[in-house]
Curated annotation (Swiss-Prot):
Subunit structure and binding partners: Component of the small ribosomal subunit. Mature ribosomes consist of a small (40S) and a large (60S) subunit. The 40S subunit contains about 33 different proteins and 1 molecule of RNA (18S). The 60S subunit contains about 49 different proteins and 3 molecules of RNA (25S, 5.8S and 5S).
Any one GO CC term of the record: cytosolic small ribosomal subunit
Designated name of the protein: Small ribosomal subunit protein eS1B
PANTHER family with a match to the protein in the record: 40S RIBOSOMAL PROTEIN S3A (PTHR11830)
Organism: Clavispora lusitaniae (strain ATCC 42720)
Length: 256
């Protein structure tokens, strides 16, 4: 009989299960902090594998983009149809300091705006902010019925639409190029630019449902930690940001 290893004896018992390893044991949680431009600064939490050896968790978190409903950031359901993108620029302990990365509309809101018997006007422009962020801004508007109009439809002539589109581009360039990214965010929340377009185009065409429907970040300047900390209020521990006002006050009539 040949002397050798008995394969039957070396085998383990059948039916034994491997010890279950919790995948979350190797991960750690981080708090996502929105800029102080928004009212609610606590966006949520995210996780990543713990730092091991040369692999640093902070490197994997920088550049992450989160999409958040503006209603959650502002604490108001009036903004539920708009989504804000926030990008992680710096990691401080367990806090992720984010910056504005873009804005978009929900698809159901956009579909609800498009109706029969009216003309759609769209315009977009690529513009640089005062702090060297290159953005592409998209605007949308619809024609509306004039006072005492009998006609059912509100279709506009193409020449009028070209005039309106030109005016929209001019206003967007002016409103974006003269402000920083943080100041622009404060304008986008109460839709100041949309109201400015409505006021300026009143003599050409009466418009309704005027919105900045999308803001896309194309290029950003060299990272500056000081400006990011200033955007987050230095300490970045406060849960509440500054309330953005629309700049319009309700007029109360003394007598009817």
């Amino acid at each position: 009989m040949a002397v050798g290893k008995n394969k039957r004896l070396s085998k383990g018992k059948k039916g034994l299960k491997k010890k279950a390893v919790d995948p979350f044991a190797r991960k750690e949680w981080f708090d996502i902090k929105a800029p102080s431009t928004f009212e609610n600064r606590n966006v949520g939490k995210t996780l990543i594998n713990k730092s091991t050896g040369l692999k640093n968790a902070a490197d994997g978190l920088k550049g992450r983009v989160f999409e958040v409903c503006l209603a959650d950031l502002q604490g108001s359901e009036d903004h539920s149809y708009r989504k804000v993108k926030l990008r992680v620029d710096e990691v401080q302990g367990k806090n992720l300091l984010t910056n504005f990365h873009g804005l978009d509309f929900t698809s159901d809101k956009l579909r609800s705006l498009v109706r029969k018997w009216q003309s759609l006007v769209e315009a977009n422009v690529t513009v640089k902010t005062a702090d060297d962020y290159v953005l592409r801004v998209f605007a949308i508007a619809f024609t509306k019925r004039q006072a005492n109009q009998v006609k059912k439809t509100t279709y506009a002539q193409s020449s009028k639409l070209r005039e309106v589109r030109k005016k929209m581009i001019e206003i967007m360039q002016r409103e974006v190029s003269n402000v920083t990214l943080a100041q622009l965010t404060s304008k986008l929340i109460p839709e100041v630019i949309g109201r400015e377009i409505e006021k300026s185009t009143q003599s050409i065409l009466p418009l309704q449902n005027i919105h900045i429907r999308k803001v896309k970040l194309l290029k950003q300047p060299k990272f500056d930690l000081g400006s990011l900390l200033a955007l987050h209020g230095e300490g970045s521990t406060e849960e509440k940001g500054k309330k953005v006002s629309s700049g319009y006050k309700d007029v109360v009539l003394e007598s009817v």
